[in-house]
């Protein structure tokens, strides 16, 4: 089930959606468009996190999975608009050498690799929290409902964060936007560790994190587009997203190992602070100017 879920998640991931949107939007609108796409995913998290939490209590996890499967199937008819080229005014030219050369050149680009490392940290952070936040809430003696609503608030706050990040892409250098986001995560986690563990602490923590949660996607995708153009944006951003998912695996898995060894997540929180600070610094040397400029017809 995990393997099939991963395939499905990859097939409708941000890289595919942002690549499709980039070829349908003028350059000045792509940042806002990516923010809207990202906000849509966050709205789904806000709506479904408490609903699924209740469904698990009522019908168990299997019944909840069936409910999510039905909702997912309802999205299939919407794909017709994405697979049609009739509304794609931007037609990027094929660079010499095609996809293979584009990927090869990208993987030798230091700025692209630095972007991967920063996004790796984002995945580590998000997967750790999504997987282990309910246990952390339980360790603090609070109801599981607090965890469900915290995840919902993360999704709600990320709608605002994603739209704001999409707008910032057109106003500021994307690498600075990312540096601020990653740095703010380190500060927020440090404040959480110092605060008393009440339900309102978790709610405030969730809102703060939600503002940067997946709001990193618009500036990250924008950087890939600035570096290499939009012709292979879906593929090149997909490779960046792969590092995000590797970080996610380690965040979830290592969180479990740390909990089994210590019965708390203290070491993971400090590791998360260190990685977030590192990600903020890693983005600063990125050369944001277009290195490969692909012509748009």
Model-derived regions, located:
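Hydrophobic core of transmembrane alpha-helices in multi-pass small-molecule transporters
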Residues: 1-12, 120, 201-215
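Intracellular juxtamembrane helix-capping segments at the cytosolic ends
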Residues: 11-25, 215-228
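A late C-terminal transmembrane helix in Major Facilitator Superfamily
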Residues: 36, 45, 227-262
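Helix-loop-helix hairpin linking two adjacent transmembrane segments in secondary transporters
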Residues: 37-85
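Interfacial helix-cap and linker-helix signal at transmembrane-aqueous boundaries
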Residues: 50-59, 137-138, 168-169, 254-263
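Flexible cytoplasmic inter-helical loops of multi-pass small-molecule transporters
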Residues: 81-101, 292-297
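Extracytoplasmic gate region of multi-pass secondary transporters
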Residues: 109-163
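C-terminal transmembrane helical hairpin of 12-TM major facilitator-type secondary transporters
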Residues: 146, 154-158, 164, 169-223
């Amino acid at each position: 089930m995990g393997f099939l879920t991963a395939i499905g998640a990859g097939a409708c991931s941000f890289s595919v959606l942002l690549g499709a949107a980039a070829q349908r939007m003028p350059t000045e609108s792509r940042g806002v468009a990516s923010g809207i796409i990202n906000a849509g995913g966050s709205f789904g998290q806000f709506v479904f996190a408490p609903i699924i939490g209740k469904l698990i209590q009522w019908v168990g996890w299997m019944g909840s999975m069936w409910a999510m499967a039905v909702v997912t199937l309802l999205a299939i008819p919407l794909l017709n608009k994405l697979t049609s080229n009739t509304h794609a005014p931007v037609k990027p030219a094929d660079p010499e050498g095609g996809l293979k050369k584009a990927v090869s050149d990208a993987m030798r680009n230091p700025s692209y690799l630095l972007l991967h490392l920063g996004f790796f940290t984002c995945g580590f952070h998000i997967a750790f929290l999504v997987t282990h936040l309910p246990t952390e809430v339980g360790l603090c003696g609070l109801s599981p409902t607090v965890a469900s609503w915290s995840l919902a608030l993360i999704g709600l706050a990320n709608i605002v964060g994603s739209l704001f990040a999409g707008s910032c892409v057109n106003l500021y250098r994307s690498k600075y936007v990312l540096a601020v986001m990653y740095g703010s995560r380190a500060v927020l986690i440090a404040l959480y560790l110092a605060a008393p563990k009440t339900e309102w602490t978790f709610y405030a923590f969730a809102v703060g994190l939600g503002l940067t949660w997946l709001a990193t996607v618009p500036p990250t995708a924008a950087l890939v587009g600035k570096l290499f153009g939009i012709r292979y944006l879906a593929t090149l951003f997909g490779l960046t997203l792969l590092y995000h998912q590797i970080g996610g695996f380690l965040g979830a898995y290592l969180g479990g190992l740390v909990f089994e060894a210590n019965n708390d997540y203290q070491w993971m929180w400090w590791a998360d602070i260190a990685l977030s600070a590192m990600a903020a610094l890693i983005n600063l040397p990125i050369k944001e100017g277009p290195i490969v400029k692909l012509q748009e017809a």
